[in-house]
Regions:
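Sec-dependent signal peptide recognition
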Residues: 2-10
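Carbohydrate-active catalytic/glycan-binding domains of CAZyme proteins
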Residues: 24-354, 358-361
């Protein structure tokens, strides 16, 4: 009942409340020209032709750099480069696992962040020595690498399965890594979102990670997954997190909000997804991030669908997002008008509530 009341409160608060964006583009003052021996910018592929999961876009030097699961040739991490978000050169390997590297597969979800003059790759791999997935940090002087691991193995706890690390800089300038503690290594098999302070050179955590929330905290989600965290501050200074789980229609993008604007300040959850398969969108999708394009538009990048089939394959999707000051809305949805938006959100809420009620009945009968 407590979760249902919290959900109803969040629903009334949904259209006008809630959180924030990522870092602005760096390298504005010059044009980054990739080495033609490394990548041929004249040979491109359309976004829709590229199979990729967990896409992450860095804007630097008037170029877009798209990293993601499946972009590398062989063990490691890869990147595509574009000038218009439609035609992509590459991919090029930004990190290739050398002989003796501890990785044993699961080269997932690389994110590239420009910080204090260096490029940092936060990325997941499966460790040969621990047989756990974890997040490591890699550093380079170029967004195209080569990147070198600087953490001496996973930075996340060795006895956890951890994935999808992302960077957040708080109001005091303190860097944090927010990451997934996978359901595969939690006591109750429910995934959690975790965070830890980073030291100045991103080589280690300062203190132990803290749990932020669990996958089943939002009443409308029925999965045990916490995927793809991304932090954003709205124009009014509200701290928001995008992340992914499953509702009754499949993979989707959730919004959660800090109660006091701090990472560890406690989190509450919107009762409707930012993106989900519904009467407006035909395909599921998730593992989202935000960036500002070269025209100043706030865009959400995610992969959709969540699983390839004979007719569709996983690819990067870019959707314009509106920062309402307290929350985020998809521009396509916002154009529908308030009443239609409320109708879609309420329909989603009722469908998920009915699905939860049916599950509850099955459990007690």
């Amino acid at each position: 009942m407590k979760r249902i009341l919290s959900a109803l409160f969040a629903f009334t608060f949904l259209f006008g409340v809630v959180p924030a964006e990522a870092s602005a583009s760096d390298g504005e003052g010059f044009v980054f020209e990739p080495d033609p021996g490394l990548i041929d910018m004249t040979k491109t592929r359309k976004t829709s032709d590229i199979t990729i999961r967990d896409p992450f876009v860095l804007v630097f030097g008037q170029k877009y750099f798209m990293y993601g699961t499946g972009a590398a040739a062989g063990p490691g991490y890869g990147c595509y480069v574009s000038e218009d978000l439609e035609n992509w050169a590459g991919p090029v390997n930004v990190f290739t696992a050398p002989d003796g590297f501890d990785g044993n597969g699961c080269y997932w979800a690389p994110e590239c962040h420009y910080y204090n003059g260096n490029f940092y790759l936060f990325a997941t791999y499966l460790s040969r020595s621990t047989m756990r997935r974890g997040v490591s940090v890699f550093r380079s002087q170029s967004p195209l690498g080569p990147f070198e691991e600087i953490t001496g193995g996973h930075i996340t706890p060795f006895d956890w399965d951890s994935i999808d690390g992302t960077l957040y800089i708080d109001g005091d300038g303190q860097p944090w890594m927010v990451f997934v503690h996978e359901w595969t290594s939690t006591v109750d098999n429910i995934g959690t979102m975790a965070a830890a302070k980073l030291n100045g050179d991103f080589t280690a955590f300062i203190g132990d990670p803290v749990e932020l929330f669990k996958a089943d905290d939002p009443v409308w989600l029925n999965g045990k997954v916490t995927d793809g965290p991304f932090l954003y501050k709205t124009k009014n200074g509200r701290l928001l997190m995008l992340w992914s789980n499953f509702n009754s229609q499949g993979y989707c993008v959730a919004r959660s909000f800090s109660r006091n604007g701090e990472i560890t300040g406690g989190w509450y959850h919107g009762v409707a997804p930012l993106y989900a398969k519904n009467g407006f969108f035909d395909l599921e999708g998730g593992h989202a991030m935000l960036f500002t394009d070269l025209d100043g538009r706030l865009l959400m990048c995610m992969h959709s669908p969540n699983k390839s089939s004979e007719t569709v394959h996983e690819t990067a999707v870019f959707l314009e997002v509106v920062d309402t000051g307290n929350s985020l809305e998809l521009a396509q949805i916002r154009q529908l008008g308030l009443f239609k938006r409320l109708a879609i959100a309420f329909s989603d809420f009722l469908r998920e509530a009915a699905d939860r009620f049916r599950s509850w009945i099955r459990d007690i009968v």
